[in-house]
């Protein structure tokens, strides 16, 4: 640690860490310049205001990953927390699977399935999720003919992992604790 930071009171350093975590999602760059382009004939959508949940809603997150993931503010908070721990791949996989299930076109479904597989499932994938060999095999077999349920087994395993591991860490984090004060 540099001498300048060592001279600061511990509470200042802790507050700086909290701010970094809370702003983490805002500091991300778009994945490509295409994300910044607005098509000529479309009007940009009004930004969705994420309303801060009530204390009661936030307290329910402790016991229910479903409630956390269904709340836009909770989802954004959870994602920021996981990014701060460099462990966001499970949530990103779960979200990609949710988006995948909404696809109607068989061609687009096959393309998205391939992308999800290459990004999260295959060995040495850039964001490889931690699933057992049996689950990988089932998922690979399901992808021979992609359907909305192709990733269900893997998604359920990852959900269980987040529920057992990530959610308790999030609930114990200063980020969540500050929020419910």
UniProtKB/Swiss-Prot annotation:
Keywords: Cytoplasm, Membrane, Signal transduction inhibitor
Domain RGS: 64-180
Keyword Cytoplasm: yes
Record-linked SUPFAM superfamilies: Regulator of G-protein signaling, RGS
Subcellular location(s) of the protein: Cytoplasm; Membrane
Gene Ontology CC annotations of this record: cytoplasm; membrane
InterPro entries: RGS (IPR016137), RGS_RGS5 (IPR034956), RGS_sf (IPR036305), RGS_subdom1/3 (IPR024066), RGS_subdomain_2 (IPR044926)
Major subcellular location class: cytoplasm
GO biological process: negative regulation of signal transduction
PANTHER family in the record: REGULATOR OF G PROTEIN SIGNALING (PTHR10845), REGULATOR OF G-PROTEIN SIGNALING 5 (PTHR10845:SF42)
Physiological role: Inhibits signal transduction by increasing the GTPase activity of G protein alpha subunits thereby driving them into their inactive GDP-bound form. Binds to G(i)-alpha and G(o)-alpha, but not to G(s)-alpha.
Name of the protein this chain belongs to: Regulator of G-protein signaling 5
Organism: Sus scrofa (Pig)
Gene for this chain: RGS5
